[in-house]
Amino acid sequence: MHISELTHPNELKGLSIRELEEVSRQIREKHLQTVATSGGHLGPGLGVVELTVALYSTLDLDKDRVIWDVGHQAYPHKMLTGRYHDFHTLRQKDGVAGYLKRSESRFDHFGAGHASTSISAGLGMALARDAKGEDFKVVSIIGDGALTGGMALEAINHAGHLPHTRLMVILNDNEMSISPNVGAISRYLNKVRLSSPMQFLTDNLEEQIKHLPFVGDSLTPEMERVKEGMKRLVVPKVGAVIEELGFKYFGPIDGHSLQELIDTFKQAEKVPGPVFVHVSTTKGKGYDLAEKDQVGYHAQSPFNLSTGKAYPSSKPKPPSYSKVFAHTLTTLAKENPNIVGITAAMATGTGLDKLQAKLPKQYVDVGIAEQHAVTLAAGMACEGIRPVVAIYSTFLQRGYDQIIHDVCIQKLPVFFCLDRAGIVGADGPTHQGMYDIAYLRCIPNLVLMAPKDEAELQQMLVTGVNYTGGAIAMRYPRGNGIGVPLMEEGWEPLEIGKAEILRSGDDVLLLGYGSMVYPALQTAELLHEHGIEATVVNARFVKPLDTELILPLAERIGKVVTMEEGCLMGGFGSAVAEALMDNNVLVPLKRLGVPDILVDHATPEQSTVDLGLTPAQMAQNIMASLFKTETESVVAPGVS
């Protein structure tokens, strides 16, 4: 049968192994075609096709709960649960989300986007089930990368003390997270894979048995059964650690053998308490290029399936903020051996893989452990090291207590570099970098800045690594820079808390922060076309705010507009409003940014329009609200 004919995942139950293999092939084909066309996560989902099909053929999906950790590997799940025909809309505005969303499907039992949450959520559902006297299975599927997160280990520790609570944890062990895994847990799993008995079983056993006199040829057809039996004899303690924690352990099993998976899941489902199924998979399975380069093909922009290469841009683009950050930090680190870059399993995304390649002794990857990364940096700062924590804005949320308790209370000079701040696009609400201004500016002993372009990012990097007055943070957006000239050396640090005037006018004061400075300048051009002259200020710092510059300008001009790519509640505009009120400068103020909503998946350009943050929209808003000018549209050549 064809997967498009499936009307419910429970229909997998009646299919033969051969039919399930055909369904798996079709899922993998659709997965590849869709990601190649529209972009998305490639390797994770390809690695769990058979796992998903086998598991769903043993469950009753009308009542059983399946929780996928992170969710980027759940594309096969989406295709099997009613979204096959819409899958071509993956990660597009109003289309299928790239992660799990409870609002999208009744089969998405728990939304996610960040790692290490599935076991906690699954255990919560299992305890609620038992408290209500209900009967359904709960399965949490977690990767070996996410298993390095402390939250996952906390949940395992808890579940292991509940011997009568039925919960199945499936470890999708593909030796990878996004970048190669680090830490003792990863090392233990690798030790299991690479142990002499396991290597003998996987590499040599069949050849040795073939050469046995008289019986070798007759045993060859039963080779898989022989391997399985001997595996259980020679590696009986593979799951010793897990069983000591209170789980019944199964594995490691072949994550691409439907029969072995189904047989194991059926046995595991009979266990009356917590059970742990260790499944070995290959990330990118079925697409040779992705199997060979599991980091490079973790996630892809649209690409040519034959060559594996992304489609070339119609015109050259400036380097991304991440690339400029990585290049500049590496240059600074060469000059100062006390600079150390720290990442939480995002070396490639943040650009710190460049630092690792050039200066490995000045690079630390802690795994998916943001809390640990922050306090590790605090400890380093105590000893005179200049730690630079490169982290996505959305992930720094996970280390919030550590920022306050371990860094700022002790006034330690830790430098936080927040990549993907602001609108991130197709990854959706779990990854939007909207909240960092609000959650950081309220903390004492912390400076918060944002560059208007990639050249100013270089200056702020120098500022950050030389700042000793406490913690300092820099937020910068996803994507390419503006295209301004860059310096290779000789960067000068900025004066803390000092803004700059970029344009002068007497009618309205436009205060742009970070990525909104250039849109502020474009907005000023549009206002000029309508006879309104604006002063444009690049704020640079939201904390400390340059009140010496801003307050006199606001008082003289009499109308103020703030522009930010972040949430309005507690954000840059709020900081300006507080400063105006505290100093009794009572002038009209218009704050432009992200209102109290979740920004769903779409392209950054689409989200910008939806939020009313294009220069044309902002100019129209300003004229309507501050100048009471009625106009249907504001258009200027080359400005949207």
UniProtKB/Swiss-Prot annotation:
Q: Which amino acids does the record list as binding Mg(2+)? A: 144, 174
Q: In which pathway does it act?
A: Metabolic intermediate biosynthesis; 1-deoxy-D-xylulose 5-phosphate biosynthesis; 1-deoxy-D-xylulose 5-phosphate from D-glyceraldehyde 3-phosphate and pyruvate: step 1/1
Checking InterPro entries in the record gives: Dxylulose-5-P_synthase, THDP-binding, Transketo_C/PFOR_II, Transketolase-like_Pyr-bd, Transketolase_BS, Transketolase_C, Transketolase_CS
| Cofactor binding: number and manner | Binds 1 Mg(2+) ion per subunit. Binds 1 thiamine pyrophosphate per subunit.
Keywords noted in UniProt: Isoprene biosynthesis, Magnesium, Metal-binding, Thiamine biosynthesis, Thiamine pyrophosphate, Transferase
User: Which reaction is recorded as catalysed by this protein?
Assistant: D-glyceraldehyde 3-phosphate + pyruvate + H(+) = 1-deoxy-D-xylulose 5-phosphate + CO2
Q: Name one GO molecular function term.
A: magnesium ion binding
Q: Which cofactor does it need?
A: Mg(2+); thiamine diphosphate
Its EC number(s):
2.2.1.7
> Which Pfam family, an example, fits this chain?
DXP_synthase_N
Gene3D superfamilies assigned to the protein according to its UniProt record, in alphabetical order: 3.40.50.920, 3.40.50.970
Family to which this protein belongs: Belongs to the transketolase family. DXPS subfamily.
Q: What is this protein called?
A: 1-deoxy-D-xylulose-5-phosphate synthase
* Species, as recorded: Synechocystis sp. (strain ATCC 27184 / PCC 6803 / Kazusa)
Gene name of the encoded protein = dxs
